[in-house]
């Protein structure tokens, strides 16, 4: 069977880490990269990563290729996706990782260029996009849609947790706080930004801001729609984040009962997606962990039908691993 042919549009943090995952898979091949940055810089950033370490391959670049251990990957710098040679290159799936082309019409520029399918590495904007969180609404990945979204890193952590709790106890309502590593959508030093809190120095401040995870989880797990609100707290770590979810359940429970449900899920239908931990974790402990969420059983608290759970996630490694899985398997 022929390998699935993949192109990546946008070779930033998620694009490069997803490339690393795909490169180790047998049934796919990344044949093209499109990014406005010069190829020498892209090759260097693919090889060396401050958070995730060295990509142990011989990597070189030329005017129109990046070569990894002798295998050439076409590399271009085209601003208009409709002008990319996806038909000529027989591209099966484009990973849209620029963060720019997030509507269905924008993503379909890749379809117009000859690709069969597009997966957006961010929450989609507007209608006509099938959002998938593996382990939660995996069946939707097999739909006839041509434009998909891998949701967000926080939604990929939150949705499996919500699904376990709701199926076991029923969720009436709740609140989410994600304590999140800083990202490129913040300023290193105080500088203008449309969000005045994100305008402040990322490595120096605790920064309250917004997250769309509470709304997004309702798209992939409809029973929870309109039952959660959320806030994000950006903190000065390079990667490694956590969610604290507080919910009112429809029936009373206990710490042991809650933890048992998550342990069961981690060993069965959410294996590889959700990890069950009994260790006293801190954020650096989960850097490089490819699970969507790492359930911290020691942090569970219950007061009647008020339940608090905590789950960790490497907002880069976990998310890019699921993105690679989605692209490779569906």
Task: Annotate the PLM regions.
Residues 3-9, 13-20, 28-29, 159-268, ...:
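Active-site-lining helix/loop region of Rossmann-like oxidoreductase modules
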Residues 230, 242, 246-330:
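C-terminal active-site/capping subdomain that shapes the small-molecule cofactor and substrate pocket
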Residues 66, 132-134, 147, 189, ...:
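Short clusters of hydrophobic/aromatic residues that line enzyme substrate/ligand-binding pockets
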Residues 151-152, 206-208, 313:
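Hydrophobic alpha-helical scaffolding
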Residues 87, 236, 300-302:
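Short glycine/proline-enriched loop/turn "hinge" motifs that connect secondary-structure elements
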Residues 2-199, 323-329:
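N-terminal Rossmann-like NAD(P) cofactor-binding subdomain of oxidoreductases
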Residues 62, 128, 202, 239-241, ...:
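A generic structural signal for well-ordered coil/turn residues at beta-strand boundaries
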